[in-house]
Amino acid sequence: VYGRRRVGKTFLIRNYFKDRLTFYHTALSPLELEGGELLQAQLQNFTSSLRRSGMEIDAAPQSWFEAFDLLIDFLSGKPKTEKIIVFIDEMPWLDTPKSGFVTAFEHFWNGWAAGQDNLLLVACGSATTWIVDRLLSNKGGLYNRVTQEMHLAPFTLKECEEYYREHGVVMDRYDQVQCYMAIGGIPYYMSFIDPGYSLAQNIDRLLFTRNGLLTLEFGRL
């Protein structure tokens, strides 16, 4: 599952599967750390996700091969009759320089996961190029391994109209077009439209006031 940031990928997956996720992990953003420090932080975070899922671990793994071995140990303890659902969010962030993540993931998938008929792995990411190059168009160990591809796009203008109607936001079509040109079809942004204000007032308070919810959004992306 891939698409631009804020489009609703994580929301869609988590709300679809709800409490059926066997293992859920969100990668750390690579913006603040780098090199070996970032790799260790990612591995520690992966360990924390395993612990939250119920696995007892004494120390964090030192490589992605060790990390996926721990994941195999955890998943192997689940009943064969139970559907195992693994969700890795922002997977591209795990592939830090010289981390060996892709090679380790290939080994995990081809050496164990592909043989588990009850396993579903959902890989999600905002870095579209990475998803396409490393997963969808992979020519190595992950060649033709993806069974379902979903590119989540922003809402169309018609879908925006349906969204606003469902959420009690009254706008004529002229204002809907104006709103679409301002914030697009991104559900996250659309959720901030307050039906108690006019479109102009909403845009002003969200984008142009000092503490507006979307004033600094461009820089964050």
Where in the sequence are the language-model features?
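Phosphate-binding site recognition
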Residues: 1-221
